[in-house]
A protein has these predicted regions:
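Surface-exposed, polar/charged faces of alpha-helical domains
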Residues: 60, 64-75, 79-82, 86, ...
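A short beta-strand-turn-helix
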Residues: 101-119
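N-terminal targeting signals for export/organelle localization
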Residues: 2-101
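Structural alpha/beta surface segment adjacent to cysteine/selenocysteine redox centers
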Residues: 122, 133-207, 237-242
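C-terminal cap of thioredoxin/glutaredoxin-like
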Residues: 4, 25-59, 63, 204-271
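The canonical Cys-X-X-Cys-His
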Residues: 129-133, 245-248
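Soluble non-cytosolic domains of exported or imported proteins
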Residues: 52-56, 67, 119, 130-133, ...
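Second-shell loop/turn segments in exported
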Residues: 45-52, 60-64, 122-128, 155-159, ...
């Protein structure tokens, strides 16, 4: 409790000390000149001088108040959380706007669905991400239900060397299949299959789907593949993506496997 109070007292003081200070007849000196507007609580605190005894008394009052009203702490934390989320959302909107071309229309990206769709969903994913596996049916359902949906896949291989290897194979496979018809089968089998994804497994899936393996093994180490993955990673960093799956729908970043219904709502809101 003491550690909480050490954090809470400065916050609570802004609210509580202003009326308390006014009641102290021996404490503060009045400002030299009256401000044009009533001073804020923070300004009042800045211009008040309390003795050590007065500070102890005030801290005791605050402590008693917080013990009697612990919901104040929760309210303060909720308000701070809301403020932070609003700031994060505003920053994300600005980042999406400034990276619009690369995010939605890069020449390196994988596009599923309608390339000219009126709504675009971008997904950052990792082939070894359990939550991405869980979210795969959501993507397939959305693509089947909406012929105007453009779905962009961005590689974000952060779950180890196997993920990086799988990403290289996947990007090389996309290079052979600009339409995405074979790629989506590859993507489903690799992401939806059991066991860890790595170079060996990704190549086996690519062979099963019918890609040109000689070309693929050459392409997977090409500058094109490296550039694609680097571009995706830089975008993820700019957007503050720290886990997968993370979606961009319209001007909003949506974190996690939120489910089909919420994705539908986000898509509808962005139309």
């Amino acid at each position: 409790m003491k550690s909480i109070l050490r954090i809470a007292i400065p916050l609570a003081a802004v609210v509580l000390l202003s009326p308390l200070a006014a009641a102290q007849t021996t404490s503060a000196q009045a400002p030299a000149a009256a401000p044009s507007a009533p001073p804020s609580a923070a300004q009042t605190l800045a211009t008040q001088t309390f003795s050590a005894d007065q500070r102890r008394e005030i801290e005791g009052i605050i402590k008693s108040y917080l013990v009697a009203h612990p919901d104040v702490l929760q309210d303060a934390m909720d308000a701070l959380d809301k403020q932070q989320k609003q700031a994060d959302a505003a920053k994300a909107r600005e980042t999406i706007k400034s990276n619009n071309a690369t995010l939605f229309n890069s020449s390196h990206q994988v596009v599923l669905g309608n390339p000219q769709g009126n709504v675009t969903v971008v997904e950052f994913f990792d082939y070894n991400c359990a939550f991405c596996k869980r979210a795969l049916p959501d993507m397939l359902t959305l693509l089947k239900a909406d012929p105007n949906l453009k779905f962009v896949l961005k590689e974000f291989p952060v779950l180890g060397p196997g993920s990086v290897e799988a990403a290289h194979v996947a990007v090389a496979a996309r290079m052979q299949d600009p339409t995405g018809k074979k790629y989506i089968e590859f993507h489903q089998k690799l992401l939806g299959g059991r066991g860890p994804a790595d170079k060996t497994r990704a190549l086996a899936v690519a062979k099963e789907v019918g890609f040109d393996m000689t070309r693929l093994e050459k392409d997977m180490n090409s500058d094109e593949v490296k550039t694609t993955i680097d571009e995706d990673m830089k975008l993820a960093d700019a957007l503050g993506v720290s886990g997968t799956p993370t979606y961009v729908v319209g001007d909003e970043v949506v974190v996690g496997a939120v489910g089909l219904d919420e994705l539908k709502q986000k898509i509808k809101a962005s139309e």
